[in-house]
UniProtKB/Swiss-Prot annotation:
InterPro entries: NADH_UbQ_OxRdtase_su1/FPO, NADH_UbQ_OxRdtase_su1_CS. One of its GO terms (cellular component) is plasma membrane. It comes from Nitrosomonas europaea (strain ATCC 19718 / CIP 103999 / KCTC 2705 / NBRC 14298). One of its GO terms (biological process) is aerobic respiration. It is found in: Cell inner membrane. PANTHER family: NADH DEHYDROGENASE SUBUNIT 1, NADH-UBIQUINONE OXIDOREDUCTASE CHAIN 1. GO terms for molecular function: NADH dehydrogenase activity; oxidoreductase activity, acting on NAD(P)H, quinone or similar compound as acceptor; quinone binding. This is NADH-quinone oxidoreductase subunit H. The gene is nuoH.
Amino acid sequence: MDSLQPLFEQLFGSEWGGPLFLLIKNLLLILAIVIPLLLAVAYLTFAERKIIAYMQVRVGPNRVTFFDIPWLRGWGQPIADAVKAIMKEIIIPTGANKFLFLLAPVLAIGPALAAWAVVPFSPELVLADINAGLLYILAMTSLGVYGVIIAGWASNSKYAFLGAMRSAAQVVSYELAMGFALVCVLMMSSSLNLGDIVAGQQGGSFLNWYLIPLFPMFLVYFISGVAETNRAPFDVAEGESEIVAGFHVDYSGMAFTVFFLAEYANMILVATLASIMFLGGWLPPVDIAPFNLIPGMVWLLLKIAFMLFFFLWFRATFPRYRYDQIMRLGWKVFIPLTLVWIVVLGMVMQLPEVVRQSFPLNLWFN
């Protein structure tokens, strides 16, 4: 694509051609990430309904199809749901702050999409390959809670506001544990660049992945990710049996759908980061044929799908935690555990080279 830059400079001049080319190039790259992401979100909802239906000995969506093709029954359900949401009216409650009520979904979906700018899908395919990629993602994901808080406050509903406060406290609690877990990855890779983190796990087999030395941190990260996305069994912010539907109880139509998209986009982001930082990213489990003949992006997508399956499995299996249980798990279990692991990891990294060579520590520590 860079070969087209001289053509733009010839058509529009050197002063305007270069910037215009970069603008169009970046817009196309953004669309190349956002459009597949939205399709993935749509069909993740379909997969969720089918998997949970299978676990509950049901059929799931099996009516909407494409061109009456029998083996595609149900595959048109996400498209039908999107059309229905677009056609529905956005009802603004009496007494609500209209501007903030409509701004809240934008504040929720914006960071959820912006975080994908630094996520690499292969060594070459990344929108913005910045050195502080991990820090950028943590900053973007922490901004999503503002949309939730504003939605709860602007709705002028006690149920929505209670759900928003629950969500804010929960996200802050588990963000600390998630951040400390990622500090361990940073210590092992010595980089905040996601591509460098994957490169640090190269070595020919899955034994070099950070999953093995950081397995407790992997569990802390993933469970904290489930809690941050308000998924079951941590979905107290949307507890139907307690506060009707949580912070988006008064939302309808596309406004509700945007919150829905943000939640599932964050789910995919958590699964993607788990795959990149602990499961070797696009690296094959063993660097021999036929595994190394499969494109790296295929391996990354398979790992993401594997991690997403646990999100769906949790929803079908576990009952909702009480709010005090969620807070206790975050503050009294995860945060102390991550702090202890950081100290232990730092001590191991300071061991002499002779001691490291007597144990298989050189697999992960260079």
